[in-house]
């Protein structure tokens, strides 16, 4: 069984200063190049699920090979090295010619590059993608990729486990029900919100053992040259960022200076009476 994880890293926007948000609101561009990169939360869950599936497969004498790929720039090499230490036998980087933040909005471009990359590989049984990224937040890439490849797509997946015979037991959340089914490849699984799926940290021994594993680099121009005309981002349209602003987290508050508990309770009661 061959599993491919398509993951994405994002800038840690919690570290962005208020002044940078204000300046970006007017220009439509926020410089995040100096911010630390972190794993997109949905992709992190997908990567951890792959690790768990591989472990369960090994204990059941089932062959399972995991590959990780990302569409980004050289900043993500440390993440791919981490994947290698965690047992991913393939660690591939699709390097963008222009990795500006606005390009994160081009879902067609990302899906097209992943499509061309997958067509150059030995066939995968399952492709795992996160629900959406924390920067573009469009949620289009997994659906576009499944459509381009012509394979089944299951959204809002909350659990997977090996079911034998190269298949997976997949749990997915629907509007009014939780569905559990045995899925055969090729299929694309969109990983949703799952609790307690932080990606594990490799040990020093694991890092030392994976030092010799090379990261395979694919250039955008190389993959874009094999785009079918109907998948060419230049002909499918793009999204242009026109404005960006932070969500205000401030709340109005009043301070009552009362040291006696009963008096403080009375003040609060009088205050809340006007809302009842």
List the predicted regions and their residue ranges.
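Positively charged, low-complexity intrinsically disordered leader regions
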Residues: 1-26
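Electrostatically charged, flexible surface regions
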Residues: 17, 157-276
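Short, glycine-rich nucleotide/cofactor-binding loops
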Residues: 30-46
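Histidine-anchored nucleotide/phosphate-binding helix
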Residues: 43-58
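A glycine-rich helix N-cap at a beta->alpha junction
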Residues: 78-113
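Conserved acidic residues
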Residues: 89, 125-126, 186
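Glycine-rich phosphate-binding loop signature in dinucleotide/nucleotide-binding domains
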Residues: 118-125
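Short Gly/Thr/Asp-enriched flexible loops that form oxyanion-binding sites at enzyme active sites
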Residues: 136-149, 153
């Amino acid at each position: 069984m061959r599993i491919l994880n398509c993951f994405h890293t994002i800038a840690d926007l919690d570290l962005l200063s208020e002044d940078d948000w204000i300046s970006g609101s007017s220009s439509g561009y926020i410089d995040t190049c100096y911010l630390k990169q972190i794993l997109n939360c949905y992709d992190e869950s997908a990567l951890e699920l792959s690790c768990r599936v591989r472990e369960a497969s090994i204990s059941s004498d089932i062959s399972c090979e995991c590959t990780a790929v990302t569409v980004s720039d050289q900043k993500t090499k440390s993440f791919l090295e981490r994947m290698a230490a965690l047992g991913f036998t393939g660690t591939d980087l699709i390097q963008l010619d222009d990795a500006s933040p606005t390009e994160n909005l081009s879902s067609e471009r990302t899906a097209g590059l992943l499509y061309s990359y997958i067509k150059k590989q030995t066939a995968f049984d399952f492709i795992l993608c996160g629900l959406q990224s924390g920067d573009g937040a469009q949620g289009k890439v997994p659906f576009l990729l499944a459509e381009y490849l012509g394979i089944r797509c299951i959204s809002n997946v909350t659990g997977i486990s090996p079911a034998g015979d190269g298949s997976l037991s997949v749990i997915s959340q629907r509007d009014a029900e939780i569905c559990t089914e045995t899925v055969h490849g090729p299929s694309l699984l969109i990983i949703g919100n799952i609790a307690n799926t932080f990606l594990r940290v490799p040990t020093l021994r694991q890092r030392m053992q994976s030092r010799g594993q090379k990261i395979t680099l694919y250039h955008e121009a190389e993959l874009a040259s094999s785009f079918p005309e109907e998948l060419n981002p230049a002909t499918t349209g793009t999204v242009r960022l026109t404005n960006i602003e932070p969500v205000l987290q401030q709340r109005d508050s009043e301070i009552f200076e009362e040291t006696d508990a009963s008096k403080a309770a009375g003040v609060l009661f009088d205050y809340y009476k006007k809302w009842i």
